[in-house]
From Swiss-Prot:
NCBIfam families from the UniProt entry: pcaR_pcaU (TIGR02431)
PROSITE patterns for this protein: HTH_ICLR, ICLR_ED
Gene: pcaR
The entry's keywords: Activator, Aromatic hydrocarbons catabolism, DNA-binding, Transcription, Transcription regulation
Organism of provenance: Pseudomonas putida
Description of what induces expression: By beta-ketoadipate.
DNA-binding region: 67-86
Region (Disordered): 1-22
SMART domains in the record: HTH_ICLR (SM00346)
A Pfam family recorded for this sequence: HTH_IclR
Name of the protein: Pca regulon regulatory protein
Length: 291
């Protein structure tokens, strides 16, 4: 998502067009129906609820949407969607090319305050900083949010940044990331197959594993060994290793990883030098959180 120059909301409303296969499917239990359930509440702000629903209509795989597509996904009338988008543009949260709309990085600030202040993120930050200082690479923590991973804490040395540089609140697809596969490995087999059946599995590089059966076998291996390396599957040149963070009952709560460039760190070094540091940090953090 690039930071683009804001343009005015198109003056002419988009003409109606029939729903097609190219249009994103409506969200189950649509926002419009959930909003309608509060019509009897005099303190409920329908306009605010609609604005939030419009923001949530955008996904990693649907970054550019038309008014018709957003209306289809949310079941909110097009006129209301248009007003929401106009407001988001004026406030610096969205932009338009005259037909499609996309969110701007400023929208991440809406969730940053919460994510960075959760007990897990607060407790994890010193460990991430220590890992980053020790290994001179970016250290991250994420949870599973729908079909994506959601970054909840991060520490990165300025001189080592690579193009995949997500701030707290950023998202990436779970299937092709080391933290994502750790979190997917915590699912039972039925839930995992359901995920692989609905997720948009595509080759982001020539090395991306995107066949459902191959991914299922890979994630089962991750589950058995307790850690995961993803080597240039998300982005050419990007290599990462991840481990799980457990809660008091032994369930996977989040994932912790270090990402690096292939020109700096070999896969063997990831496993021999980075992995013990990550496992120790995971163990110490779990002990701090749950005793």
């Amino acid at each position: 998502m690039s930071d683009e120059t804001l343009v005015n909301d198109p003056v002419n409303p988009e003409p109606a067009r029939p729903a097609s296969a190219a249009m994103a499917p409506p969200i189950v239990a649509s926002p419009a129906k959930r909003i309608q359930a509060f019509t009897g509440d005099p303190d409920f702000m329908t306009s605010l609820a609609r604005g939030l629903a419009v923001i949530q209509a955008f996904q990693e795989r649907k970054r550019h949407l038309t008014i018709a597509q957003i209306s289809h996904r949310t079941e909110i009338p097009r006129a209301a969607v248009r007003r929401c988008l106009h407001t988001l543009i004026k406030l610096g949260y969205a932009t338009s090319d005259g037909r499609t709309y996309s969110l701007l990085p400023k929208v991440l600030t809406l969730g940053h305050a919460y994510l960075s202040s959760t007990p897990l993120a607060i407790s994890a930050q010193p460990y991430l900083d220590r890992i980053s200082d020790q290994l001179h690479e970016a250290a991250n923590m994420a949870t599973l949010e729908g079909d994506d991973i959601l970054y909840i804490a991060r520490s990165a040395t300025v001189e080592r940044l690579i193009s995949v540089d997500l701030s707290v609140g950023g998202r990436l697809p779970a299937y092709c990331t080391s933290m994502g596969r750790i979190l997917l490995a915590a699912m039972d087999d039925t839930s995992l197959r359901e995920y692989l059946g609905r997720a948009d599995l595509k080759a982001r590089t020539s090395r991306t594993l995107h066949d459902p059966e191959s991914l299922f076998a890979c994630i089962q291996q991750v589950r058995a060994q307790g850690w995961c390396v993803v080597d240039q599957e998300l982005e050419q040149g990007l290599r990462s290793i991840a481990v799980p963070i457990y809660d008091a009952s032994g369930q996977v709560l989040a994932a912790l990883n270090v990402s690096t460039h292939v020109g700096r760190v070999t896969r063997s070094e990831l496993e021999q030098r980075f992995l013990p540091i990550l496992l120790a940090a995971s163990r110490d953090l779990c002990h701090q959180l749950f005793g």
